[in-house]
Curated annotation (Swiss-Prot):
NCBIfam families: rplA_bact (TIGR01169). It comes from Pseudomonas putida (strain GB-1). Pfam families: Ribosomal_L1. One of its GO terms (cellular component) is cytosolic large ribosomal subunit. The gene is rplA. The keyword tRNA processing does not apply. Binds directly to 23S rRNA. The L1 stalk is quite mobile in the ribosome, and is involved in E site tRNA release. Transmembrane segments: none annotated. This is Large ribosomal subunit protein uL1. The keyword Iron-sulfur does not apply.
Amino acid sequence: MAKLTKRQKAIAEKIEAGKSYNFEEAATLLASLPAAKFVESYDIAVNLGVDPRKSDQVVRSATVLPHGTGKTVRVAVFTQGPAAEAALAAGADRVGMDDLAAEMKAGDLNYDVVIASPDAMRVVGQLGQVLGPRGLMPNPKVGTVSPDVATAVKNAKAGQVRYRTDKNGIIHTSVGKVGFEAGKLKENVEALIADLKRIKPASSKGIYVKRVTLSTTMGPGLVIDQSSLNV
């Protein structure tokens, strides 16, 4: 068995195995642990009472967190005409059509979000093998294919998170940076869970939000006592 590093030992000494933590307690504890050499994110994992093998129980959506994620988001938009001007005015980093597609095919993929207006999908459709593996392919289910590209850009810049259940019925997303006030972080998590409940599949039975776990990028996951959340 591999030996624990000094950092791992220091973390293990502060964590109570099997404990469900009050949200503020968990956030404060995670922030106090030995840090990595970069500003870590707070990440949330929510175990849902769904069967992801059934297509009608795949949970996929996007929501704008009230306090953002603390990340600077680079956005590319496929559109043209007045919509292109609106996208730039909303803060898009790059707007184009065939020219933008050519750049991406050549390897220029330094974007966090790619948005497209419906009329631009004829161009975007050629980029499936480029954008798909990186999770950048525009999709109407998460608001990245929209006739209102300006609003889509504003949402992305404001801290919109996109999520989808994995094969175990768990969604994972970042909800802020270490350094966020615990109250604001909590409101972000509550907004996410409220959105998950809003889109609960009709065929999902029993307990829907089964478990909520908060962690930092390089830190341990702490199970949250859901009674400490206003959801």
